[in-house]
Amino acid sequence: MNCLILWSWKLAVPTITKANINRGVVKLKTINPILNTFITGDCEQVLKEIPSDSIDFVLTSPPYADKRDYGNENSSISPDEYVEWFLPKGREIYRVLKPTGSFILNISDKVVDGFQHLYVFELLLRLCKEVGFHLVRDYIWYNPATPPNVYSRGGYGRTKKSHEYCFWFSKGSDWTFELDPIRKPYSKDMQKYLDGKGK
């Protein structure tokens, strides 16, 4: 399985490394030169060098839309600009995925002017309608670093989020899900219910 994990979106490293693929201009004609290789660089540029239909799985957690300074060039993105910023990367992810490939997007939303901004949901719609992804499932990742809390700002109270989203997209309709690694045995009550001996 060829997996691609895009974690750092814009690093201070200007080109793909592995000794700059033997110090030449990087042009990857096959996936073999990057197997088992740690690659750093601007993810959009790195993706452009990866052959089409060559990756089975992509996992990414792009920067938050909070105008946070990550210490890198062009690293702060506002919620209003987020969808347009991400879509070119989404198109490249779609291109490099095999027809049976999957893509997990870990993303968080943002409250702006007292209301939850809708950029996450707009991004989901556009990734499916414009890029061609299929949304297989959404998952909630509980983040213990941000415990639930209540806070008030400007007279409005609300609970603080303690989760982020993980959206599972597929490129085509023939995707794979391995259930066995996460299965748990049924409880006694559930087994009785399934056997028709309980309510």
Model-predicted segments: where are they?
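Core catalytic lobe of class I
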Residues: C3-K199
